[in-house]
Amino acid sequence: MKKLLAIVLAAILCLGLMAGCGQTTIIVNMGDDAEATPEATPEATPEATEPAAENTAAPVVDDTPLPEGQLKTGLALVSVVSSSSKAATADADGNAQADTTFVAVLVDGDGVIQDCLIDCVQTKIAFNAAGEIVTAANTAFDSKIVLDDAYDMRKASPIGAEWDEQANFLADYVVGKTIDEVKGIALDDGGKPTDADITTGCTMNIAEIVTGIENAVANAKVLGANVGDTLKLNCNAIVSDSSKSASADGNGTAQADVTVGAYTLDASGVITSCYLDCVQAKIAITAAGEVASEVGTAYDSKLVLDDAYDMRKASPIGAEWDEQAWFFAEYVTGKTPADVAGIALDESTHPTDADITTGCTMAVGAFIAVIK
């Protein structure tokens, strides 16, 4: 009996030690599934040095054997409260800003990156000195790749290069490298590269991009992409209608929803793999017009949250958000983007086709918007 008691106590002690080793994954949560129409372009913050999001992620590696001629498809998001966030004054609105970096990769069976796409979107939500949200719900934000020269970093760049040019240079640089080689990229205290092989084409802060590349490779899955397929990456970023003004009863929430889609197309324009995710960046604001969320606060994406997103109990089919997203991604594989654009939806962008609603009943308007 004493021996049995000792064994039980030892087991409890081990469980306690294990519980202290939890990890937090830093990946961005994508939008609330609403379709958006791009409006005003956000103001650029050239070569800004953001506090790097610590890469504490521990993605589940897909050990599925890679069929001959295929590649793994990976996607990762890194979303943080920007240091450009600022309080409101009597003379000017405040800015609740989240920066979401997202990366897509194709990886071969040896873990070597065969293709890489990098992008970032700055979601800037204005609020006044009373903590009232000023930016309208569903206001859309273009990514830096889409903005191109309108992002306006070139004049501040020591090499005269725009953000998208530097991001594309870095993406090309990591092709042919493994995740360990990417982790080995030397950065200074401001997150900027120091290797001359990189600084000839990229001198901006890349700390969060490197984290995104690492996580995208680690997250890569066998989804059907083949050697020779074309990798695509798009986002749909909007002000969520869940945003609310502050009041005497509590802080308000400036919420941006960013939905991201990475997919591959074969030579005929047919989708061969699809990876979807979404992050909800919720920045707290006070009734005094101040930003209550700390700079650098990171947000997990819905895929990372898994059951913690807690949609299952509200789902008519008892399915969590990530389960429905994967079902929809599998459904569109084998179709063209034009086919996807023609999917029947109700007025709230919920699918109506029984072939979809058996596994996905949530709004998919944002998914369709990023597959184009």
Pin down the residues of each PLM region.
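Bacterial lipoprotein signal-peptidase II cleavage site
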Residues: 18-37
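Intrinsically disordered, low-complexity segments enriched in polar/charged small residues
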Residues: 7-8, 43, 47, 51, ...
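Intrinsically disordered, low-complexity regions enriched in polar/acidic and amide residues
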Residues: 22, 46-49, 165
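Sec-dependent N-terminal signal peptides of Gram-positive bacterial secreted proteins and lipoproteins
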Residues: 2-24
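Generic cytosolic/nucleocytoplasmic N-terminal low-complexity/intrinsically disordered segments
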Residues: 1-2, 54, 143, 301
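Ser/Thr-rich, Proline-interspersed low-complexity disordered segments
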Residues: 31-64
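Active-site- and interface-proximal helix/loop "cap" or "latch" segments in soluble metabolic
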Residues: 63-372
